[in-house]
Structure formats: structure tokens, C-alpha cells
């Protein structure tokens, strides 16, 4: 294992997991499993519809742990959490599937998605087209592409794999340079992560600085560091109506009630 940044270590481990996975399932196997899934729920469409209604488009995250905070929620029931989120106004769900660093699991995603009618984003570190078809095979409706973890060639390859698999894409950036790279793709939704994945430090100003550089016909989702109604108001006053929030909900006894209190 390398001694680089947290992101470097995650990607190195992910590449090992993919190599192991390919020995169990070929790309052909995953394509067949993906094609057997019911049609994906429209992740992008749900977000745009919420914003068109004048409401915040909340992607509510199901996350047990993180590298920087350790275990966030001991009492972890993804089905119960998913239902509470849906009942309290979430537009979409995000489910962590990385096991090594976030204590996630693909079974959590399957269980959560089967319990609700909301579109579900697979929150993981996608670096290989094999994972894109794996994502659809497990039932997810959208994937996350983290620009900091990918070359331009990888982004292009993964974006087109997602189109083939029938997945929507949330492209995540943290800097002006990453945003410029992301805009080379025909993306509709741009996630601006206020947390630097190399250091795990968080600044809400990251979204406020980068959002004006996103074309007006794109939807911006601010990610990480949203904890108070003042944070929400700050974003909405600046024309940002998409939110991805996890930790703020996961630390509360009732994550759904926490969502409602923060946004509605």
C-alpha cells in the first residue's frame, strides 16, 4: 500500500478489488446482468424536477463510516434509513458501497433501493468500465465520477460506458481545473465537493467560487459540509439548489427528521 494521499490509497485498493472482481465476473457476465435489470429510475430527471418545483433537490446519503471520521453510525439499517429519507422529502439516495474505507456494501445499495421508489446513486470510486456495468447490475441508477481520481481518457471512457449501461452520471469536481476538465464531457449535473479528497478538509466557499463557472443550463450539486439551515440558505441565495448530504443526517437518531429539519 502506498504512503500517498487518502485518495491515492483508496484508488490503489480499488484497483486490487477490480482485479479480484474480474476473476469472478467477466464484462460479458456483468453486461448480461445489467441488461436484466429493470429500467433505471431517472436520477437527473428527479433532481431537475425538484428544482423546477422551487424545492431543494436533496441527494440523501446512506453512509456508515468514513476514513476521516471513522464509524459515523453504529445503529446502521439501510432499509430504515432509506424509507425515512423518502418520507421526509429526499429527491434521490446515495449509497456508499466501498467496504475498505467507508464500511459500505453493495447489499446496502440493493436493500435500500428495493425499499423505496427513489433513484439511487452508487457512491464509490469508479475507475474502470467493469465497475460501471457492475453498478447497473446491482440495480443502481447513477454513478459518481470523481475527476480528481481520473485522467481525461478515463473520464471519457467511463462516461460512455455509463451511457451504454443506462446509468446517469454525477461528475464531481473540487477545483477550477477539474471543472474545466469535466466540462469536456456532455454532463448535465456537476457535483462540487467542498471536501478536498486529498486532505479531507472542507470549505463551503469551494462551491461558491466554482458554481458561477458552471454553464447556466447545468445543475450544480453542492457536496459535503452542509450542516445548518444557514448553510442551505447561503447556497440557495447563490442559485445552488442541489445538495448531497450524508454525515449531518447519519449522526442524528432519526436521519429522515434531520433531513426535514435542515431543508423543509
Positions of the model-derived regions?
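C-terminal helical cap(s) of enzyme catalytic domains, especially alpha/beta-barrels
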Residues: 209-213, 236, 251-264
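Catalytic-face loop-and-helix region of soluble metabolic enzyme cores
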Residues: 189-245
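Glycine-rich phosphate-binding active-site loops on the catalytic face of alpha/beta enzymes
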Residues: 134-154, 191-200, 240-259
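Active-site beta-loop-alpha junctions enriched in small/polar residues
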Residues: 13, 61-65, 98, 125, ...
Amino acid at each position: 500500500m502506498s504512503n500517498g494521499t487518502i485518495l491515492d490509497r483508496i484508488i490503489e485498493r480499488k484497483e486490487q478489488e477490480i482485479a479480484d472482481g474480474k476473476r469472478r465476473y467477466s464484462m460479458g457476465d456483468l453486461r448480461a446482468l445489467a441488461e436484466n435489470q429493470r429500467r433505471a429510475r431517472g436520477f437527473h430527471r428527479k433532481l431537475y424536477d425538484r428544482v423546477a418545483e422551487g424545492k431543494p433537490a436533496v441527494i440523501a446519503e446512506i453512509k456508515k463510516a468514513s476514513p476521516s471520521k471513522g464509524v459515523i453510525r453504529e445503529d446502521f439499517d439501510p432499509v430504515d434509513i432509506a424509507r425515512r429519507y423518502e418520507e421526509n422529502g429526499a429527491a434521490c439516495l446515495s449509497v456508499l458501497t466501498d467496504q475498505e474505507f467507508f464500511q459500505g456494501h453493495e447489499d446496502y445499495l440493493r436493500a435500500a433501493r428495493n425499499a423505496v421508489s427513489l433513484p439511487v446513486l452508487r457512491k464509490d470510486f469508479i475507475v474502470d468500465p467493469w465497475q460501471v456495468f457492475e453498478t447497473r447490475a446491482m440495480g443502481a441508477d447513477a454513478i459518481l465520477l470523481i475527476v480528481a481520481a481520473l485522467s481525461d481518457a478515463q473520464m471519457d471512457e467511463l462516461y460512455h460506458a455509463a451511457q451504454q449501461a443506462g446509468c446517469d452520471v454525477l461528475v464531481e469536481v473540487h477545483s477550477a481545473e477539474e471543472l474545466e476538465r469535466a466540462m469536456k464531457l456532455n454532463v448535465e449535473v456537476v457535483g462540487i465537493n467542498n471536501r478536498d479528497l486529498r486532505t479531507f478538509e472542507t470549505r463551503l466557499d469551494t462551491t461558491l467560487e466554482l458554481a458561477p463557472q458552471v454553464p447556466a443550463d447545468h445543475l450544480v450539486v453542492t457536496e459535503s459540509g452542509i450542516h445548518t439551515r444557514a448553510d442551505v440558505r447561503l447556497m440557495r441565495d447563490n442559485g445552488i439548489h442541489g445538495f448531497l448530504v450524508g454525515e449531518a443526517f447519519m449522526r442524528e437518531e432519526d436521519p429522515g427528521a434531520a433531513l426535514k429539519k435542515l431543508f423543509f
